[in-house]
Regions:
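N-terminal, post-signal peptide beta-strand-biased segments of exported outer-membrane/organellar beta-barrel
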Residues: 39-154, 158
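Generic recognition of cysteine residues
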Residues: 2-6, 12, 22, 132, ...
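The feature marks either
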Residues: 35, 145-147, 236
Length: 490
């Protein structure tokens, strides 16, 4: 499941209020905007393009032929979405029906779900970025805003919603619904980076980048389990709990219970939790205007390229090895406590209260999760950013004007790693002209191709060209830069 790039940007940066409908859409769909380095790895099709500076993000040892100055924002803007469940056309339907809780219980939606549904999204844009050659060294600097998110939702969550709508024939005298697993992670920060690439000799180039990180926000919600159990006699197996009334429930005898184990950790300016009369979180408010720096961290990229001769080269890199330390004053920890969610028909009104908790029609049911903020746990916390490994092999032909390459990348993301294999064909007739055709068969199930081109100052590229409404992943990078002088050695 996935949400469109524009929706995610709105969700992270401009949303004035995180309404329940938006939360439902996020829980059903979510997130990943940019390419897969867990926070803006560049499009993989750039890896073997010697004229593209964006490949430095994949491997700091791969310096471009010329220096550059990226124009603010439009010098480097990239985004991507990926899901293991739904295509881009389904995303449009999800956003269109975000206010309609019934949509997420329809056969059309439910039939496309897997046992565990993953989605991820990341986005990045440069505030400023530049690089230039000095002798055999290439220096670069950047200030980049990055955002990424990952979501996992079990199908059982939607099965339970359908149960509460009376869509499944259930024996409520011995009903048990176990919902295991599920988490949401969102991270937003600014990267201040300085990179250096050194051509050691004709065979070896080394590169590295050190980064200071300014954390703007981090949210981690994990649900280990949710168990709903009833031992109720006298109920219709097809009961729609969302329309149940006290008269209908008065016929029932027995007990019911809800047991949830969940944890919420967050650090962000402008993120406020509203509490119910019983003291648990029942609403979330986000004020984008109050967003600021509430965490500091550091990271590094390391890379190497080895060319045994003029025709072949091997390369490897690890990027985004780092962490962010979030301040105590902006950190909230909350834990579920459902000890009071036990109901007995002998207690007047108990079953109606049970109905109010379980039949909200929301995928993210805060009333059922019963998250209580622990003031004693309001202390600093540390989170890792998502690192990526890259391994490449390249063959150069036609006096270095044609390149054929293979690239393997693995993003060490949560809740699952994302691996991709990219086969690339590149034609580089002039220093300011570069064209690439690529094919990445794993993440998109072999249903898409990649294209990239650099025409003077303009760059456009994608690893997954939109080809059908069922495409489950898509990314794009657009950039405009001012070219500077090239390297002065052979």
């Amino acid at each position: 499941m996935c949400i469109s790039c524009c929706f995610f940007i709105e969700y992270c940066f401009t949303m004035k209020r995180l309404r329940p409908a938006c939360m439902r859409a996020a829980i059903v769909a979510l997130l990943v905007l940019a390419t897969a380095t867990g926070n803006a790895q560049s499009v993989r099709s750039t890896y073997f393009m010697e004229g593209a500076q964006y490949r430095l993000q994949l491997n700091p040892a791969l310096a471009p032929e010329r220096g550059y100055i990226n124009l603010p924002v439009i010098g480097h803007a990239e985004a991507s979405v990926r899901s293991n469940t739904m295509g881009l056309n389904d995303v449009v339907d999800i956003i269109k029906n975000a206010d309609d809780a019934d949509y997420f219980t329809t056969d059309k939606f439910y039939g496309k779900l897997k046992d565990m549904n993953h989605a991820s999204a990341t986005a990045a844009t440069d505030v400023i970025a530049a690089g230039f050659w000095h002798g055999k060294g290439f220096m670069s600097l950047n200030m980049t805003v990055k955002a990424d998110g990952n979501l996992s939702v079990p199908r059982e969550m939607f099965s339970f919603m359908r149960d509460m709508k009376g869509m499944n024939h259930n024996d409520y005298s011995n009903y048990l619904r176990d919902i295991n697993g599920g988490d949401l992670n969102v991270n937003v920060y600014t990267e201040l980076g300085f990179g250096y690439t050194r051509v050691i000799n004709d065979h070896v180039s080394l590169g590295g980048r050190v980064k200071g990180l300014l954390g703007h926000g981090n949210v981690s919600l994990k649900m280990e389990k949710a168990q709903i159990k009833t031992n109720l006699e006298g109920l219709d197996p097809d009961l729609d709990w969302t329309t149940a009334d006290p008269i209908m429930l008065a016929k029932a005898t027995g007990s019911a219970s809800v047991d949830v184990k969940a944890t919420l950790e967050s650090s962000a300016h402008g993120l406020n939790y509203k509490l119910s009369r019983d003291g648990y979180i029942d609403d979330v408010e986000f004020k984008a205007g109050k967003m600021g720096v509430c965490g500091l961290g550091a990271a590094m990229d390391l890379g190497i390229e080895y060319s045994p001769n003029d025709m072949f080269s091997l390369s490897a890199a690890v990027t985004d090895l780092g962490f962010i330390r979030w301040s105590k004053g902006n950190t909230v920890r909350a834990y579920s406590n459902t000890s009071d969610l036990n109901y007995d028909s002998n207690n007047p009104g108990d079953l109606m209260r049970f109905t109010d908790v379980v039949a909200t029609g929301k995928a993210l049911n805060l009333d059922m999760m019963r998250l209580y903020i622990d003031e004693q746990e309001a202390k600093a916390r540390t989170t890792n950013i998502t690192s990526t490994m890259a391994l490449g092999a390249e063959c150069r032909l036609m006096e270095n004007r044609m390149h054929i390459g293979t690239l393997f990348t693995n993003r060490f993301s949560k809740p699952e790693n994302q691996s991709e294999l990219t086969f690339s064909f590149n034609y580089h007739p002039r220093s300011l002209l570069d064209f690439t055709f690529s094919y990445s068969p794993i993440l998109c199930s072999g249903q898409s191709i990649g294209l990239a081109m650099k025409l003077g100052p303009l760059f456009i590229g994608t690893d997954y060209l939109y080809m059908s409404k069922n495409t489950k992943c898509c990314n794009a990078l657009v950039g405009i830069s001012v070219p500077l002088g090239g390297r002065s050695f052979d």
